[in-house]
Amino acid sequence: MRLGLLILLLVPLEGGGAQASPAQARVSARANDRYDPTFRRYSKRYFGAGFDWFLFKAQAMAESELNPDARSWVGARGLMQLMPSTFQAIQTKRPEFASIDDPEWNIAAGIMHDRYLWRLWGREIGEGQRIPFMLGSYNAGEGTIGRAAAAARASQLDATLWPNIEHVAPSVPRWRYRETLGYVKKIDGNIARLRSNKPRG
């Protein structure tokens, strides 16, 4: 499956200072693979066998650095940094998702929420552009990205193209757009890192 814009935006994540050797980078990128089976399982369940599960691991890396105990200042929790209200809404459909603090259920709920956003944007956006809209909505809320799309249309731009959302982002009120645009790019960089360290064969 094409990942569209995301696989084209290869943004370096490392800042200045000493750089890790290629061997160290491989170890670092693969050090926390304990949740890989869970990412694989729920990626397949909610997006199908052909979908690249690295996307969701890369998202969790951006959200929590794969720390199941992560807490944000706004109250988001766990690997996928879910708000308790979002998790509770998902629990009404999946009561077996017992606890937001259980890594498996946190991942499962995060990917299930991604699927909701994927389908939401699928009504008007093709697969090649849909991933950044999904991720942007996960970060900022679908209403915010919807307002950005409306601003793009008002500017006579194609609102189904993520670069046009980036273009109008500064004009969208009540949106910390730099955080959202950086979030999408960071996930793309994480995917590149994961793929570069994927074993051959």
Protein language model regions, located:
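Short amphipathic alpha-helical segments
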Residues: 36, 53-57, 80
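Short, surface-exposed glycine/acidic/tryptophan-bearing loops
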Residues: 70-90, 153-156
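Non-catalytic cell-wall polysaccharide-engagement segments
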Residues: 16-37, 88-112, 116-201
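Short, hydrophobic secondary-structure boundary micro-motifs
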Residues: 68-69, 147
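Surface-exposed patches in mature extracellular/periplasmic domains of secreted proteins
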Residues: 46-56, 70-71, 121-135
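N-terminal export signals and maturation junctions of secreted/periplasmic proteins
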Residues: 2-47, 68
